[in-house]
Amino acid sequence: WEYEYMAFSRRVGELWEPFCKLCFIYPLTNIRLFVPPLFEEVKRNLANEISNYIDGLRIKTTEKVQLKKYYDKVWGLVTSGEIQLECDLHFTEGTNKYIVDFKSGFGSNEKGNTNRLLLVGSIYKNIEAENYKCLIFVRSTENNHYLTTLHNSGVWEISCGVGTYERIRDFTGYDIHDWITSNIDWMNDFSPHMRESILRN
Protein backbone atom coordinates (compact mmCIF):
# COMPACT_ATOMS: atom_id res chain seq x y z
CA TRP A 1 0.00 0.00 0.00
CA GLU A 2 1.63 3.22 -1.13
CA TYR A 3 -0.14 5.59 1.26
CA GLU A 4 0.79 9.18 1.90
CA TYR A 5 0.76 10.19 5.58
CA MET A 6 -2.81 11.54 5.98
CA ALA A 7 -4.39 8.75 3.92
CA PHE A 8 -2.63 6.12 6.03
CA SER A 9 -3.78 7.85 9.22
CA ARG A 10 -7.38 7.76 7.97
CA ARG A 11 -7.11 4.04 7.14
CA VAL A 12 -5.83 3.37 10.66
CA GLY A 13 -8.80 5.29 12.06
CA GLU A 14 -11.22 3.29 9.92
CA LEU A 15 -9.91 0.09 11.53
CA TRP A 16 -9.51 1.48 15.05
CA GLU A 17 -12.95 3.04 15.55
CA PRO A 18 -15.10 -0.06 14.84
CA PHE A 19 -12.64 -2.17 16.86
CA CYS A 20 -13.26 0.07 19.89
CA LYS A 21 -17.01 0.25 19.27
CA LEU A 22 -17.33 -3.54 19.45
CA CYS A 23 -16.74 -3.23 23.20
CA PHE A 24 -19.85 -1.04 23.48
CA ILE A 25 -21.98 -3.24 21.24
CA TYR A 26 -21.19 -6.33 23.36
CA PRO A 27 -20.37 -4.87 26.81
CA LEU A 28 -19.65 -6.81 29.98
CA THR A 29 -21.39 -4.02 31.93
CA ASN A 30 -24.94 -2.64 31.97
CA ILE A 31 -24.44 0.17 29.44
CA ARG A 32 -26.95 0.41 26.58
CA LEU A 33 -26.80 2.03 23.16
CA PHE A 34 -29.45 4.63 22.26
CA VAL A 35 -30.57 6.56 19.20
CA PRO A 36 -29.65 10.27 19.41
CA PRO A 37 -32.37 12.92 19.10
CA LEU A 38 -33.00 14.75 15.85
CA PHE A 39 -32.00 18.40 15.80
CA GLU A 40 -35.51 19.45 14.72
CA GLU A 41 -36.90 17.73 17.81
CA VAL A 42 -34.41 19.48 20.10
CA LYS A 43 -35.07 22.82 18.42
CA ARG A 44 -38.85 22.42 18.73
CA ASN A 45 -38.69 21.53 22.43
CA LEU A 46 -36.36 24.42 23.23
CA ALA A 47 -38.44 26.87 21.17
CA ASN A 48 -41.59 25.83 23.06
CA GLU A 49 -39.78 26.22 26.37
CA ILE A 50 -38.59 29.73 25.49
CA SER A 51 -41.98 30.73 24.09
CA ASN A 52 -43.73 29.62 27.28
CA TYR A 53 -41.19 31.53 29.37
CA ILE A 54 -41.71 34.72 27.35
CA ASP A 55 -45.50 34.33 27.60
CA GLY A 56 -45.17 34.27 31.39
CA LEU A 57 -43.22 37.54 31.61
CA ARG A 58 -45.00 40.59 32.99
CA ILE A 59 -44.45 42.74 29.93
CA LYS A 60 -46.62 44.10 27.13
CA THR A 61 -47.88 41.75 24.43
CA THR A 62 -46.01 43.77 21.79
CA GLU A 63 -42.78 43.29 23.75
CA LYS A 64 -43.38 39.54 23.95
CA VAL A 65 -43.86 39.42 20.19
CA GLN A 66 -40.63 41.38 19.68
CA LEU A 67 -38.67 39.06 21.99
CA LYS A 68 -39.88 36.03 20.05
CA LYS A 69 -38.82 37.67 16.79
CA TYR A 70 -35.30 38.22 18.15
CA TYR A 71 -35.23 34.62 19.34
CA ASP A 72 -36.22 33.43 15.85
CA LYS A 73 -33.41 35.54 14.35
CA VAL A 74 -30.85 33.75 16.51
CA TRP A 75 -32.20 30.37 15.37
CA GLY A 76 -31.98 31.60 11.79
CA LEU A 77 -28.24 32.15 12.22
CA VAL A 78 -27.66 28.76 13.81
CA THR A 79 -29.80 26.71 11.44
CA SER A 80 -28.65 28.04 8.08
CA GLY A 81 -27.69 24.40 7.42
CA GLU A 82 -28.96 21.12 8.82
CA ILE A 83 -27.19 20.21 12.07
CA GLN A 84 -26.48 16.52 12.59
CA LEU A 85 -26.48 15.63 16.28
CA GLU A 86 -25.40 12.06 15.54
CA CYS A 87 -21.84 11.26 16.59
CA ASP A 88 -19.90 7.99 16.43
CA LEU A 89 -21.39 6.38 19.54
CA HIS A 90 -24.29 7.01 21.94
CA PHE A 91 -24.79 4.99 25.12
CA THR A 92 -26.38 5.23 28.54
CA GLU A 93 -24.91 4.34 31.92
CA GLY A 94 -27.37 4.79 34.75
CA THR A 95 -28.96 8.22 34.36
CA ASN A 96 -26.14 9.57 32.19
CA LYS A 97 -26.25 9.67 28.40
CA TYR A 98 -22.86 9.68 26.70
CA ILE A 99 -22.08 11.13 23.29
CA VAL A 100 -18.76 9.85 21.91
CA ASP A 101 -16.67 10.98 18.95
CA PHE A 102 -13.73 8.76 17.97
CA LYS A 103 -10.61 10.30 16.45
CA SER A 104 -7.50 8.51 15.28
CA GLY A 105 -5.67 11.81 15.76
CA PHE A 106 -5.99 15.56 15.31
CA GLY A 107 -4.10 16.76 12.25
CA SER A 108 -3.70 20.08 10.51
CA ASN A 109 -7.07 20.02 8.72
CA GLU A 110 -9.44 19.70 11.67
CA LYS A 111 -10.80 23.28 11.86
CA GLY A 112 -14.19 22.51 10.29
CA ASN A 113 -14.66 19.37 12.36
CA THR A 114 -13.64 21.21 15.53
CA ASN A 115 -16.28 23.89 14.93
CA ARG A 116 -18.93 21.23 14.29
CA LEU A 117 -18.03 19.38 17.49
CA LEU A 118 -18.19 22.61 19.51
CA LEU A 119 -21.66 23.35 18.13
CA VAL A 120 -22.98 19.81 18.60
CA GLY A 121 -21.52 19.53 22.11
CA SER A 122 -23.02 22.88 23.12
CA ILE A 123 -26.46 21.79 21.90
CA TYR A 124 -26.30 18.60 23.97
CA LYS A 125 -25.13 20.54 27.03
CA ASN A 126 -28.17 22.82 26.74
CA ILE A 127 -30.71 19.99 26.73
CA GLU A 128 -31.57 20.31 30.42
CA ALA A 129 -34.12 17.49 30.42
CA GLU A 130 -31.32 14.93 29.90
CA ASN A 131 -27.92 14.46 31.53
CA TYR A 132 -25.70 14.38 28.44
CA LYS A 133 -21.92 14.02 28.69
CA CYS A 134 -19.76 14.54 25.61
CA LEU A 135 -16.57 12.50 25.22
CA ILE A 136 -13.83 12.42 22.59
CA PHE A 137 -11.71 9.26 22.41
CA VAL A 138 -8.42 9.86 20.58
CA ARG A 139 -6.06 7.06 19.57
CA SER A 140 -2.96 9.22 19.18
CA THR A 141 -1.13 11.04 21.97
CA GLU A 142 0.36 13.54 19.51
CA ASN A 143 -2.31 16.11 18.70
CA ASN A 144 -2.55 19.83 17.95
CA HIS A 145 -4.23 23.06 19.06
CA TYR A 146 -7.63 22.03 17.66
CA LEU A 147 -7.89 19.31 20.29
CA THR A 148 -6.70 21.80 22.92
CA THR A 149 -9.52 24.13 21.83
CA LEU A 150 -12.07 21.37 22.38
CA HIS A 151 -10.56 20.49 25.75
CA ASN A 152 -10.59 24.12 26.92
CA SER A 153 -14.20 24.61 25.81
CA GLY A 154 -15.52 22.69 28.79
CA VAL A 155 -18.02 21.03 26.44
CA TRP A 156 -16.05 17.88 25.60
CA GLU A 157 -14.09 15.60 27.91
CA ILE A 158 -10.97 14.37 26.11
CA SER A 159 -9.08 11.08 26.47
CA CYS A 160 -5.95 10.24 24.46
CA GLY A 161 -3.81 7.13 23.96
CA VAL A 162 -3.81 4.79 26.95
CA GLY A 163 -6.30 7.11 28.67
CA THR A 164 -8.84 6.28 25.95
CA TYR A 165 -8.44 2.54 26.53
CA GLU A 166 -8.86 3.07 30.28
CA ARG A 167 -12.18 4.85 29.71
CA ILE A 168 -13.33 2.06 27.37
CA ARG A 169 -12.43 -0.50 30.04
CA ASP A 170 -14.30 1.49 32.72
CA PHE A 171 -17.46 1.67 30.61
CA THR A 172 -17.46 -1.78 28.97
CA GLY A 173 -15.30 -4.08 31.08
CA TYR A 174 -12.89 -4.83 28.21
CA ASP A 175 -9.16 -4.10 28.51
CA ILE A 176 -8.43 -3.76 24.81
CA HIS A 177 -5.10 -2.04 25.47
CA ASP A 178 -3.85 -5.25 27.07
CA TRP A 179 -5.25 -7.24 24.13
CA ILE A 180 -3.52 -4.98 21.60
CA THR A 181 -0.22 -5.19 23.48
CA SER A 182 -0.44 -8.99 23.65
CA ASN A 183 -1.68 -9.71 20.12
CA ILE A 184 -0.54 -6.98 17.72
CA ASP A 185 3.00 -6.23 16.58
CA TRP A 186 2.44 -3.92 13.63
CA MET A 187 5.94 -3.80 12.21
CA ASN A 188 6.33 -7.56 12.28
CA ASP A 189 2.74 -8.23 11.20
CA PHE A 190 3.12 -6.10 8.05
CA SER A 191 4.57 -7.52 4.86
CA PRO A 192 8.19 -6.44 4.16
CA HIS A 193 6.99 -4.10 1.38
CA MET A 194 4.43 -2.42 3.67
CA ARG A 195 6.99 -2.11 6.47
CA GLU A 196 9.50 -0.45 4.15
CA SER A 197 6.83 1.97 2.90
CA ILE A 198 5.97 3.04 6.46
CA LEU A 199 9.61 3.49 7.46
CA ARG A 200 10.23 5.50 4.30
CA ASN A 201 7.35 7.89 5.04
Question: Where are the language model's segments positioned?
Answer:
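Active-site metal-binding core of divalent-cation-utilizing nuclease and nuclease-like domains
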Residues: 36-93
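Active-site-adjacent loop/helix micro-motif of nuclease/hydrolase catalytic cores
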Residues: 106-116, 145-146
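Short, charged, amphipathic alpha-helix that recurs within catalytic cores of restriction-modification
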Residues: 113-126
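Surface-exposed cleft-lining segments at the edges of enzyme active sites
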Residues: 5-9, 72-77, 101-109
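Nuclease catalytic cores
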Residues: 1-29, 35-37
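Domain-level recognition of nuclease-like catalytic cores that cleave nucleotide substrates
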Residues: 135-201
